[in-house]
Amino acid sequence: ALASKATGYPLAFVAAKLGLGYGLFDLKNSVTKTTSAFFEPALDYVVCKIPRWDLGKFHGVDRELGSSMKSVGEVMAIGRTFEEAIQKGLRMIGQGMHGFVGNKELVIEDIDKSLREPTDKRIFVISEAFRAGYTIDQIRELTKIDKWFLDKLMNIYQTSKELNKW
């Protein structure tokens, strides 16, 4: 469902028709109604799907995330870059945060421990770790999060630092 929503390409419809024996050239593009469905969607945007956690409403619930589903919903954020999309998504998840950076009400007693534990707040802990001087490699070692994502989050943090100079 996310791929169809994000691309505008009717994957389920096309897959069903292919299963019935139609070819891609037989199917019409649902948008143009003239060209065939044999095309690759050209996207100039990035989509981030972020689970919405509401663990504070449930008493006694462990905040650590694992294989069991604890999300109460999700947001789908769209932007020209990953940085823009993740910022939009983090603002929409309803945790009272201002995005990746600028969350002064977040209290972290032990950054290393908070980075190691996969919780609903860990992405915001990463921002605090950057502020405390942690490097991308240090955070990667503690979280096991791919460096590509940490580089993008560092871009947001650096941009915030630049804007705060003004």
Tell me the role of every PLM-derived stretch.
Residues 1-166:
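ATP-dependent carboxylate activation and anion-phosphoryl transfer catalytic cores
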